Amino acid sequence: MSKSEFQVIIVGGSIGGLTLAHCLRRAGIDHIILEKSSSPAPQIGASIGILPNGARILDQLQLWSEVEDYIEPLSTATIGLPDGFSFSSSYPQIINERFGFPIAFLDRQLLLEILYQRYPDRSKIRLEEKVTAVETSDSGATVTTSNGSVYRGGLVVGADGVHSIVRREIWRASKKLSSGLTAEFRCIFGISSAIKGLNVGEQVNALFDGLTIVTIHGKNGRVYWFVIQKLDKKYIYPNCPRYTKHDTTVAAEQLRNIQFYRDITFGQVWENRETASMTVLEENTFKTWHYGRLVLLGDSVHKMTPNIGQGANMAIEDAAALTNLLHNLQKISGTLSSTAAQIETILRQYRRIRYERVESIYRDSRFLVRFQARDGLLNILLSRYYAPYAGDLPADMASKTIADGVMCDFLPPPKRSGDGWKRYRRDGQLRGWRFHAMLCILMLAILYTWVGRTNLDSIVFSACGSLFQKLSVPT
């Protein structure tokens, strides 16, 4: 297959899929997107958090300036507990200052619209093309859609989400049939118009037992919100609950009277809703990322809860990392070879580059959703007796996660930046902090049984502070 014949077939016009198309276009690599929806930017009531590691890539692709028109950078986060105790952190503002890009939220629909409208050749984005079959061989890959169209290329990328047909074919072909995808939480999510008392640029995290209410207050007071609840048991994919609009309404009405911030109730958020939906929150990072000429990115291969805000950013990074490898092969060889051996080498490198980072962030996400839902005694203790006194620790931990992000190495780095990229980069040292965290948790349990809850405020902070302080020192 000659260079002119090599084509990347992207299954799914998701944020990851459209970002990959922009990356491939800038790298001069032929591609096409097959999207099952009739609209490139459907409104499903979801919001998207863009963190500096994702924003930096969008800036390289000359898309960030348009995204900025729709966002209000976060400056403050307030955390509230069931006993009425609350505290605030300026970690969002610190992140902005360190990296030159903010933590910000906007409608998922708006980001998709920007990615679609700013793509210059719409003929490469095929709507209403539902993929029904995917095949891979030594000589190429074939994709068939529901209308009978057949597409042939050198590589198929599954950017088709948690129910990925490309992943299903990888499992079948590689005989890896155990998914490992589980769900222990569900989420009601939506977008509401402005509510008096919820100030622009602020975020509220209200932590209850088995329940978390998160509101992010964006441009013009627009409220992006999540209500995360612990399920009655652990579900294993694909046998997870599916929810109707009626289910969403019933679940939301049951929470109507909960005061989550000062005198503001969830009922006020619900009454002001523009869109809302409910879904289970699947969790997993799959170990198998590719087979033959098939490869995965985004939610199709790593699914995490929204608490950490890195889901879309990981998909954006995946797109950049995969394009980097294809571009390097093209630069070295002068062509994109379609030999199975070279494709296999590229995909092995892609998985090796991405897996450890994604797995680390996935584990952070697993911890955070349980911490914010006060799931278990240890998380109750941490939320009440350590988190309020952690100072800049949340910003320092987030900085290390952000600084390790990849970008498009075939494009100039953004002109806007901050010293955080170099200062907090860990060069692959992703696991060290967990030892200290687990040790601190163990100490908390011992202290709890030793002194009881009465004196924990001072003792726990004193005993654990030195351990967590190690996390604040850039490596």
From Swiss-Prot:
One of its GO terms (cellular component) is membrane. Keywords: FAD, Flavoprotein, Glycoprotein, Membrane, Monooxygenase, Oxidoreductase, Transmembrane, Transmembrane helix. InterPro entries: FAD-bd, FAD/NAD-bd_sf, FAD_mOase_fung. Glycans are attached at residue 147. Pathway: Secondary metabolite biosynthesis. Its cofactor is FAD. It is found in: Membrane. It is an enzyme of class 1 (oxidoreductase). FAD binds at residues 35, 49, 108, 299, 312. It is a multi-pass membrane protein. Disulfide bonds: none annotated. Gene3D superfamilies: FAD/NAD(P)-binding domain. Its main location: membrane. One of its GO terms (molecular function) is monooxygenase activity. The chain crosses the membrane at residues 8-24, 432-451. Its EC number is 1.-.-.-. Belongs to the paxM FAD-dependent monooxygenase family. FAD-dependent monooxygenase; part of the gene cluster that mediates the biosynthesis of the indole diterpenes janthitremanes such as shearinine K or shearinine A. The geranylgeranyl diphosphate (GGPP) synthase janG catalyzes the first step in janthitremane biosynthesis via conversion of farnesyl pyrophosphate and isopentyl pyrophosphate into geranylgeranyl pyrophosphate (GGPP). Condensation of indole-3-glycerol phosphate with GGPP by the prenyl transferase janC then forms 3-geranylgeranylindole (3-GGI). This is FAD-dependent monooxygenase janM. It comes from Penicillium janthinellum. The gene is janM.
